[in-house]
Regions:
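Short helix-capping segments at alpha-helix termini
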Residues: 13-18, 89-91, 119
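A short, acidic, amphipathic alpha-helical segment used as a generic capping/interface helix at domain edges
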Residues: 76-88
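Surface-exposed alpha-helical segments enriched in charged/polar residues
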Residues: 12, 39, 85-88, 114
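Acidic/histidine-rich catalytic cores of soluble enzymes
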Residues: 1-77
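A short, acidic, flexible beta-alpha connecting loop/helix-capping segment that sits on the rim
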Residues: 96-105
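C-terminal helical cap(s) of enzyme catalytic domains, especially alpha/beta-barrels
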Residues: 104-119
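Tryptophan-centric aromatic hotspots in well-structured domains and transmembrane helices
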Residues: 26, 93-95
Length: 119
């Protein structure tokens, strides 16, 4: 018998009016597939946080992260194009570009936006 997680309880026990705010970085940090999760919550995601994670980090991550774990979109291991496609298909209204740690936040957001516009 497989035990349920807190996430499973939210998805199964709350009605469809319960919306989720999903962060693709932390989904990937748990070694899960963001696209599958987005598809599984189709119609129930109000906001999607787009972040990228440094290539070469062993997943899943337990405990602390190095400050350089957060990368500009397109510079890490998370393929954003299928995530954006899944988000559109799932009816996600708002996507937010984030980078928790950056030596130059303005340059980082600019680089991430250039990447997104190129998709």
């Amino acid at each position: 018998m497989q035990e349920s997680t807190g996430y499973d309880v939210f998805v199964q026990e709350f009605g469809d009016e319960m919306m989720f705010e999903v962060d693709v970085f932390w989904i990937k940090a748990a070694n899960l597939d963001p696209v599958s999760l987005i598809k599984g919550l189709s119609g129930r995601i109000s906001q999607l946080h787009l972040k990228d994670i440094k290539k070469g980090i062993n997943l899943p991550i337990y405990g602390g992260l190095p400050k350089d774990a957060f990368k500009e979109l397109g510079n890490g291991m998370i393929p954003m194009e299928p995530i954006i496609e899944a988000a559109k298909a799932a009816g996600v209204a708002h996507c937010h570009v984030e980078q928790d740690q950056s030596p130059d936040p303005i340059a980082s957001i600019k680089e991430s936006m250039v990447y997104l516009k190129g998709l």
